[in-house]
Every structure is written in C-alpha cells, then in structure tokens.
Amino acid sequence: MKTYEVELRALISKEQHNSLLQHLNKLAEGEIDNAKTYTFLTSKLNIKVKNQITKNKAKITVKKGAEYQQQVDETELLINPKDVEKAVKLITALGFKKHISSIQKRINYVLDEITVSLKHETNWKYHIEAEIVVNTKTKIPVAKEKLKLFFKKLGIKPMTEEETRTLINSIRKKYGLEEI
C-alpha cells in the first residue's frame, strides 16, 4: 500500500529534550528505538538502511522526495538485521557511492495519530520529529495542520523546509556529497 509521510521537525536543546521526555512520558509510553543508520541522499531520493538495534529488526526505507521536504512518498522493506551490510553494498552497487552513517538514540511515542520521536543523532544532535502517515495525497494538508498545532501546543517552532535544507546541505558537505 502506498503511503505518504507528513513530518515536521525541530532542533532542540538537551534541556528541552529532557523536559519533553518528562512531558511525553506522562502522555504515553515511550518505545526505545536506537539504531545505526546508513543514509543515501539524492535530490529526489532518500534511501535508508536502518539496523534497529534495540528492536533486533532492520529495514530499508525509500522516500521519494528530498530529505528536507515535509511530505514524501514512502516505501519500507523489512530485512534481517544480519543483512544490513549486504543491503548497504547492494545500494552502493546500484550507483549510490557515498552514504552518511549515523548513530541514533530515539524514543517514539504514539499520541492519537501522531508519532512523536525524541532523538539524538550524530549529525542532527537533539531534535524532535512528529509525523502522520496518510494513504492519499488529499489528506496531506490536514495532517500538516495537525502537526503544526501539535508543535504550537508544545511551544516549539518547527523547522521550515528551507531551514531543513540548509542543515541537510551542511551535513552533505561534511560527508563530501553535493548540495541539494
């Protein structure tokens, strides 16, 4: 089934992270999802091979659209965690020569239809991400408004696509990848 991920993010301080952790733990049970991720980025594709260490799972995620976009067409394929290195080699063999490796510490919360993730990642540092997955493009605007309202209630300003693009380009430059 085709799905569309609608997502907003915000960079936060360690103090904000800790405060949000306490707040979200009162609203829902958090699920730890620490991972080692290999990200292959182009201007039109975001391919991630993710070894979800704490869940003993792994997956390949392909997002059509640039990493900075707030809504993308997303497809996932579950793989055996033992096959993560093979998946990275396969994607590299397809012409994606460089990738960004990162370690991510993540706690996910499900609040109604919103999945909220508090994260600390190698390149993004502390940040919060909130997403809604919809099955038709017509539902994207409503989902985006719900996410904006969620961030507003938290007192956090989500990043714009341009702010996200600037951050991603600085990360891409660090790893010798062309800017998008």
Language-model segments: which ranges?
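N-terminal strand-loop-strand beta-hairpin
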Residues: M1-E113, K157-I180
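Short, low-complexity, polar/charged sequence segments that are solvent-exposed and flexible
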Residues: L27-G30, I79-K82, I128, N135-T138, ...
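A short, polar/proline- and glycine-enriched secondary-structure boundary/capping micro-motif
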Residues: Q69-E74, E129, I140-P141
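Conserved, surface-exposed functional patches that form binding/active-site neighborhoods
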Residues: K97-I140
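Mixed-charge, glycine-accented linear interaction segment located at domain edges/termini
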Residues: T136-L167
